[in-house]
Swiss-Prot record:
GO-annotated molecular function: 5-hydroxy-L-tryptophan decarboxylase activity; L-dopa decarboxylase activity; pyridoxal phosphate binding
Protein name, as recorded: Aromatic-L-amino-acid decarboxylase
Swiss-Prot/TrEMBL catalytic activity: L-dopa + H(+) = dopamine + CO2; 5-hydroxy-L-tryptophan + H(+) = serotonin + CO2
UniProt-listed InterPro entries: Aromatic_deC (IPR010977), PyrdxlP-dep_de-COase (IPR002129), PyrdxlP-dep_Trfase (IPR015424), PyrdxlP-dep_Trfase_major (IPR015421), PyrdxlP-dep_Trfase_small (IPR015422), Pyridoxal-P_BS (IPR021115)
Sequence positions that bind pyridoxal 5'-phosphate: A148, S149, T246, N300
CDD domains for the chain: DOPA_deC_like
Keywords: Acetylation, Catecholamine biosynthesis, Decarboxylase, Lyase, Pyridoxal phosphate, Repeat
Phylogenetic placement of the source organism: Eukaryota, Metazoa, Chordata, Craniata, Vertebrata
Subunit details: Homodimer.
Organism the protein comes from: Cavia porcellus
Modified residues (N-acetylmethionine): M1
Domain of life (superkingdom): Eukaryota
Signal peptide, first to last residue: none
Family listed: Belongs to the group II decarboxylase family.
Sequence repeats, residue ranges: 58-115, 118-178
Length: 480
């Protein structure tokens, strides 16, 4: 493909993408395929000779689209949203064209410097404390990670290195292995599974703190666990507080947990993967109160801030905590400015070496939507969630299982877990809308999350009528 054909095919692809998104609600939101459907549709090995673009694009509809779960459909109400916007897609195209691997300032100055500025822009939108901003000469700063899972792992590994060095400075006879076997980290029992995985990868105990009646981690439960573990000779060093849990969008109490972490010299990491986007709205910013106690903070613009995956924003108060844990300087990566104090080499802030020019997406989206446009997007989703909540409350057969704070509604039929499992199977088998469940204590609960950029009140109303009809059918069968 030469430049001339690329121009022509590129315009065709833009038309295809625009048509796909404009007509997405006419497609089944959940694919009607079985595991292994794709392999018989394609050859068993790559072609020896080039194939035509026409053949490839024809196979998109024949092979790929039948197996796609359409996350951007206005009838997709599962998981959490994946952000999507035309400015972000255009920026991703440019990112692919530039195709730099921005592991250091020298590898691509613009890639590095735009990321630093965009994380400061976003930090100011969230009204983060100045300590988290790079500014002109700040000690903290932001970095784009691939996911919240990566951010949690990076924070845990940095905290682990920091506590080991602190203890060895006080007691040089202590070995790293002796310290490691006593380290213990904490999170709520509502924390995402990636938090437990970070403990597994980091080789440390991860203890889950029982949450309260609102599914939040509180000071009393954390303090009890700390005292018990210290009495047993363990070394508490790391706490993950979740703002907007995956199950039900509950919020750990930063104002309670934060001071304990500071008093005990434990690293506090905040995981706000989903909810963090909402903090750009003044009416939701109070949910972040207590962030000043944290050592690191993370959320995913790629969930709710119209920036396509992947883009997970992470800030730290002390950049040296990350650099101290990850810095390696082989001669082939060194450059003349690295010790100047004027630049950032992001390879020392993350686990991989390579990194894409992801800040372009943020730059395009922030400029083309503006803060007000992004706030309007958040507020629309929250309003639609409350609309769905109101519909559920009007039907006495159903119950709301958790206060609706942002864009997630947790609900269920009154009755057994089996009844609700049957209802969910009916919903997803019909493929008109897509939902996923959660467990809240011993209850099987349905999650209804407003996800699509294109979702409107009509889609919510249609989804509710569909759920009600299926519920009536399930209840009739139960009584039969």
């Amino acid at each position: 493909m030469n430049a001339s054909e690329f121009r022509r095919r590129g315009k065709e692809m833009v038309d295809y993408v625009a048509n796909y998104l404009e007509g997405i609600e006419s497609r089944l939101v959940y694919p009607d395929v079985e595991p292994g459907y794709l392999r018989p549709l394609i050859p068993s090995s790559a072609p020896e000779e080039p194939e035509t673009y026409e053949d490839i694009i024809g196979d998109i509809e024949r092979i790929i689209m039948p197996g796609v779960t359409h996350w951007n459909s206005p009838y997709f109400f599962a998981y959490f949203p994946t952000a999507n916007s035309y400015p972000s897609m255009l920026a991703d195209m440019l990112c692919g064209a530039i195709s730099c691997i921005g592991f250091s300032w020298a590898a691509s100055p613009a890639c590095t410097e735009l990321e630093t500025v965009m994380l400061d822009w976003l930090g100011k939108m969230l009204r983060l404390p100045d300590a988290f901003l790079a500014g002109n000469a700040g000690m903290g700063g932001g970095v784009i990670q691939g996911s919240a899972s990566e951010a949690t792992l990076v924070a845990l590994l940095a905290a682990r290195t920091k506590v080991i060095r602190r203890l060895q400075a006080a007691s040089p006879e202590l070995t790293q292995a002796a310290i490691m076997e006593k380290l213990v980290a904490y999170a709520s029992d509502q924390a995402h599974s990636s938090v437990e995985r970070a403990g597994l990868i980091g080789g440390v105990r991860m203890k889950l703190i029982p949450s309260d009646s609102n599914f939040a981690m509180r000071a009393s439960a954390l303090r009890e666990a700390l005292e018990r573990d210290k009495a047993a000779g363990l070394i508490p060093f790391f706490v993950v507080a979740t703002l907007g849990t995956t199950n039900c969008c509950s919020f750990d109490s930063l104002l309670e947990v934060g001071p304990i972490c500071n008093q005990e010299e434990m690293w506090l990491h905040i995981d706000a993967a989903y909810a963090g986007s909402a903090f750009i709205c003044p009416e939701f910013r109070h949910l972040l109160d207590g962030v000043e106690f944290a050592d690191s903070f993370n959320f995913n613009p790629h969930k709710w801030l119209l920036v396509n995956f992947d883009c997970s924003a992470m800030w730290v108060k002390q950049r040296t905590d990350l650099i101290g844990a990850f810095k390696l300087d082989p001669v082939y990566l060194k450059h003349g400015h690295q010790d100047s104090g004027l630049i950032t080499d992001y390879r020392h802030w993350q686990i991989p070496l390579g990194r894409r020019f992801r800040s372009l997406k943020m730059w395009f989206v922030f400029r083309m939507y503006g803060i007000k446009g992004l706030q309007a997007h958040i507020r629309k989703h929250v309003q639609l969630a409350h609309e769905f909540e109101s519909l559920v409350r009007q039907d006495p057969r159903f119950e709301i299982c958790m206060e609706v704070t942002l864009g997630l509604v947790c609900f269920r039929l009154k009755g057994s877990n089996q009844l609700n499992e049957t209802l969910l199977k009916r919903i997803n088998s019909a493929r008109k809308i897509h939902l996923v469940p959660c467990h809240l204590r011993d209850k099987f609960v349905l999650r209804f999350r407003i996800c699509s950029r294109q979702v409107e009140s009509d889609h919510v109303q249609q989804a509710w009528q569909h759920i009600r009809q299926l519920a009536s059918s399930v209840l009739r069968l139960e009584r039969a």
